[in-house]
Amino acid sequence: MIDFSIATASDAEAIHELNYLTFTEEIPQHQPNIERKRIDRFHDQNTYLIGKEDDRLVAMIAIRKHRPFSLEEKGVTLDETLTDPAEIRLLSVRPEYRNSRTFMQLMRFLMVYLERETIDHVYISGTTREAKLYARFGFTPIAATLGSGDAQFVPMLLSRATYERSVIADVLRPLHFLAGPVEVAPTVRQAAQQAPRPHRTASMRQLDQDLRGRMCQLLDLPHVSMAVGSGTLANDIVAQQLSGHGLILNGGEFGQRLIDHAARAGKSFDIHLLPSGHPIELEQLASQLHQTEYDWIWLTHCETSTGVLYDLDAVKALLNQRTALIVDAISAVGTGRFSYAGCRFVTTVSGKAIGGLPGLAFIGHTSSVLPSSRIPRYLDLGLYAEGVAFSGSSNLLLACQAALDALDLDQAAIKMTYLEQAVRATGFNLLATQEAQAPGILTIVHPSATALGDALRIQGYHVQYESDYLVRNQWLQISTMGQTTMRHIERLIRVLVRENQRITIKNEQNERPLNP
């Protein structure tokens, strides 16, 4: 197994040896020397992306951001309209490792690095013997061939756009273990590719009615309204419906966002803080409810940031008849069998555990809602009561229908149970206690969460670790929402354990990147 990482100071000698092997002995670009080492003239400016097997350097790419680039020194005119491009100074793979798998892994590492560094364009002098291989990855020639004999090179440019259109991009696309956007079933993609329907036609109205009916069944509520937008829109719509004095339960980043929704809507409310990673302390909540009579309580069913699922039935039992329960169920719906019967408003979306494409916001409610001239039109829940209220996308509705057809709530629970047990058994520190663990997403507390997330992505597994609140808390999240399989999860766990061990060793050795 080849491990990919950014080179440290201890890798320098091996880099010089591989540079010599490739660009002196194999490609006669430089004169031989007794030491059989070649130090790149821009070595101190290079960032080296390397692959090692059993501690032996087998592949590398050197990235340089400083102008002028090598091609410019050779007289090639570069596009001056590009923002902060870079160049690949060296690209080398040992002959015995020149199979498509090694090169593809190296290229995936390159694309992860370029994205992290916000580099959209990179130049290379590609050897003519590998020009077809470069083209498969999206490199395009920009000038005539340079050099002579066995040392001929084609000036080429790779952009994120040409990479995404390349024949290899789908092969290298990582598996998503995200809470959104999620991996979708092939039938969902196929449904989304149908010809769009005008939003005022009878077929569109029927599609809208059918989908809202299925969502009523899923939520166990008599009414569901649908808007084109995100979960943020759904919660903004709900905030407009709140009146009187309320209580917001805040157990993390998304509880905090409910506070922001209510504050922006000018609502009156108190805040009840929940312990991070733990169930609701019912006695404390009951005490606050006893002290103040609230018109509504708003909480997240699944607090996505911590991976905690709150007990709605326990909260319901504490409320009197006049207190409305409002639920953000965006990361809960589709992860298990839940009834939201009796909840005044419930929000969810198409692009999370339901498994559809992002773009549909659902608001479930216990009773019909009339339009109000005091509410901005797009935030007026009453305008959505009869179905299609504004311009919408039939493709999103068709994709969501296909996602509901593919949704297996029992399998969702099995996958998450296996993942949680396996991760706990390997010694990782999970933020949520076992009794509070959500069935769709878990949060790992790790001192090198960002490095671990990068390592997983390089290996082809995209988990959540880049949001500001995750970086700030050193958290990494794995979600089983969407079309993940048990085989995918088993492979992810093996890679997770291996990369964690590698990072731990590197941290113990206090290794730092070469040329940081």
PLM regions: where:
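Active-site C-terminal subdomain of aminotransferase-like
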Residues: 183-184, 351-426
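Conserved PLP-binding catalytic core of the aspartate aminotransferase-like
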Residues: 429-459
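Active-site phosphate-binding strand-loop segment of PLP-dependent enzymes
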Residues: 279-330, 334
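Short amphipathic alpha-helix that is part of the acyltransferase structural core
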Residues: 1-38, 43, 48-58
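Conserved acyl-donor/pantetheine-binding loop and adjacent beta-alpha core of acyl/acetyltransferases
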Residues: 42-46, 50-52, 56-98, 152-153
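PLP-dependent enzyme catalytic core of the Aspartate aminotransferase-like
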Residues: 476-516
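Conserved beta-loop-alpha segment that forms the PLP phosphate-binding cup at the N-terminus of a helix
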Residues: 212-215, 221-247, 251, 255-260
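Acyl-donor binding region in acyl/amide transferases
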Residues: 74-151
